[in-house]
């Protein structure tokens, strides 16, 4: 199917109804515990967290989000665990970076560490021992934003500016768009129960529409009360974040946002970058 490549300049108010039933389009969403009800009233626009870059890790060693710990840095020896140790010391506070674990069929973890970086839209493979150099090369700005003078700051603080070391990394462009659904069961049951239904529906709709788009699950990304949370990573545009997505809205997202490049207002949590 032909897809338009254009800026997200067009909005539509409502998600259109599905045109066909894949077999799971009208699947009933499982009930939630009384203390885990969905927020059906808060205006979604502006609820997406702001980030400068989003790193998706595939080399975490966890097969399903049903077994992934509630905090991804609790996986011993993982990229997330090592990243947590370094982030406060090395990252720029003016350029926030989010690291998430992702599971996508057809994308393996590689022999070392494999990550996707957005909005750069690149795949990078590297050795875990080179994580500090990875942060310096990919996750720091060329020039730091001037901050307010802090008389208590250490004179020997690590500079938060880019240092290039390309020989340590295998970098390739990302060639396919990606849809990720929050499915972090042990972090919050709401996303854990909705995600399998959304994953199945996206897979069926994308196949029906003959669209070559990857789809998978991602760890906690914020706003479980707005489940299902869906992020669409386009090769050409900033990521788009939707909330309160249910199976019957998947066809509308595919048709309006992925194919036509339009944003659906009632589901829109914001652009994350």
Swiss-Prot record:
Segments spanning the bilayer are: none
Q: Which CDD domains match?
A: TRX_Fd_Sucrase (cd03062)
Which InterPro entries does this chain map to?
Aim32/Apd1-like, Thioredoxin-like_sf
Q: Which SUPFAM superfamilies does its entry note?
A: Thioredoxin-like
- The cysteines joined by S-S bonds are none
One Pfam family it belongs to: Suc_Fer-like
Q: Which family does the similarity line name? A: Belongs to the AIM32 family.
Q: What is this protein called?
A: Altered inheritance of mitochondria protein 32
What species does this protein belong to?
Clavispora lusitaniae (strain ATCC 42720)
Q: Which gene encodes it?
A: AIM32
């Amino acid at each position: 199917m032909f897809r338009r490549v254009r800026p997200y300049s067009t909005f539509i108010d409502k998600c259109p109804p599905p045109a066909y039933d894949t077999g799971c389009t009208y699947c009933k969403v499982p009930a939630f515990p009384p203390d885990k009800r969905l927020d059906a009233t808060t205006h979604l626009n502006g609820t997406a967290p702001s980030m400068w870059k989003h790193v998706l890790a595939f080399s975490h060693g966890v097969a399903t989000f049903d077994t992934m710990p509630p905090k991804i840095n609790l996986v011993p020896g993982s990229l997330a665990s090592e990243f947590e140790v370094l982030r406060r010391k090395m990252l720029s506070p003016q350029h926030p970076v989010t690291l998430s674990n992702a599971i996508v069929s057809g994308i393996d973890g590689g022999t070392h560490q494999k990550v996707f970086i957005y909005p750069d839209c690149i795949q990078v493979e590297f050795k875990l021992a080179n994580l500090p150099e990875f942060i310096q090369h990919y996750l720091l700005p060329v020039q730091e934003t001037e901050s307010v003078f802090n008389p208590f700051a250490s004179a020997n603080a690590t500079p938060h500016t880019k240092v290039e070391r390309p020989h340590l990394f295998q970098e390739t462009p990302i060639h396919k768009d990606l849809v990720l659904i929050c499915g972090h069961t042990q972090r919050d049951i709401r996303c854990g129960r909705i995600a399998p239904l959304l994953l199945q529906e996206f897979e069926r709709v994308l196949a029906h529409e003959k669209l070559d788009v990857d789809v998978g699950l991602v760890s906690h990304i914020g706003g479980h009360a707005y489940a299902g949370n869906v992020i669409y990573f386009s090769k050409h545009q900033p990521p788009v974040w939707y909330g309160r997505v249910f199976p019957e809205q998947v066809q509308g997202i595919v048709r309006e946002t992925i194919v036509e490049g339009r944003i659906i207002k009632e589901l829109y949590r914001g652009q994350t970058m």
